[in-house]
């Protein structure tokens, strides 16, 4: 049975010319020859650069980031290595009064103290932080000559004086 042909007037495109085995082999040899000569010459790394006069230029163009500037001892030494410490960013020193005011107005400290007064237990980190801040407040108050104990004693004395007046019937 014959296959039906397409439309009578339609022509097929001509087939592309297929290369013979010899032509393919010749092209492969040409590609290989070009590829073979595309690299650096043998021993180019050991021999250095091809231009002998360019060594002075190479030293000028050398990247300054490469290599260490500090000498490194290669043997075992008894002296410890002294490292240069980078200065930490200096915090502005506050006067004791300013630091005390800052600590007394600290919102986090106030919130944690309110939680303690309400009967809540703080975790270890929060408790440690609160203790450190309260200790610092005590130190600053001693430096400034202030103390809570004096205020409490004065209040107790005033209460006793008030009671004595009431008992004696005085105004």
Swiss-Prot record:
Q: Does the keyword Ligase apply?
A: no
Q: Where is the composition biased (Acidic residues)?
A: 148-160
Please provide the record's keywords in A-Z order.
Answer: GTPase activation, Ribosome biogenesis
Kindly indicate whether the keyword DNA repair belongs to this entry. no
Question: Which stretches are tagged as biased composition: Low complexity?
Answer: 40-59
Please provide an example of a Pfam family that matches this protein in its UniProt record: YihI
Q: Where is the composition biased (Basic and acidic residues)?
A: 20-30
Cystine bridges: none
GO BP annotations listed: ribosome biogenesis
Instruction: Give positions of region: Disordered.
Output: 1-99, 145-171
Q: Which GO terms describe its molecular function?
A: GTPase activator activity
* HAMAP family found in the cross-reference section: GAP_YihI
Membership in a protein family: Belongs to the YihI family.
Entry function: A GTPase-activating protein (GAP) that modifies Der/EngA GTPase function. May play a role in ribosome biogenesis.
Assembly notes: Interacts with Der.
> Which protein are we looking at?
Der GTPase-activating protein YihI
Q: Which organism is it from?
A: Enterobacter sp. (strain 638)
Q: What taxonomic ancestry is recorded?
A: Bacteria, Pseudomonadati, Pseudomonadota, Gammaproteobacteria, Enterobacterales
């Amino acid at each position: 049975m014959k296959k039906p042909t397409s439309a009578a007037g339609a022509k097929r495109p001509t087939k592309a010319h297929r290369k013979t085995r010899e032509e393919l082999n010749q092209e492969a040899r040409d590609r290989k020859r070009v590829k073979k000569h595309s690299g650096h010459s043998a021993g180019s790394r050991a021999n250095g650069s091809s231009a002998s006069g360019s060594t002075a230029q190479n030293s000028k163009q050398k990247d300054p980031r490469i290599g260490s500037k500090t000498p490194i001892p290669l043997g075992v030494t008894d002296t410890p290595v002294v490292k240069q410490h980078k200065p930490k960013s200096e915090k502005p020193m506050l006067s004791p009064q300013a630091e005390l005011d800052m600590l007394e107005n600290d919102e986090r400290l106030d919130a944690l103290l309110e939680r303690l007064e309400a009967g809540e237990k703080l975790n270890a980190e929060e408790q440690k932080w609160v203790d450190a801040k309260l200790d610092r407040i005590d130190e600053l108050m001693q430096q400034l000559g202030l103390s809570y104990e004096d205020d409490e004693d004065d209040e107790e004395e005033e209460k006793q004086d008030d009671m004595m007046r009431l008992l004696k019937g005085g105004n």
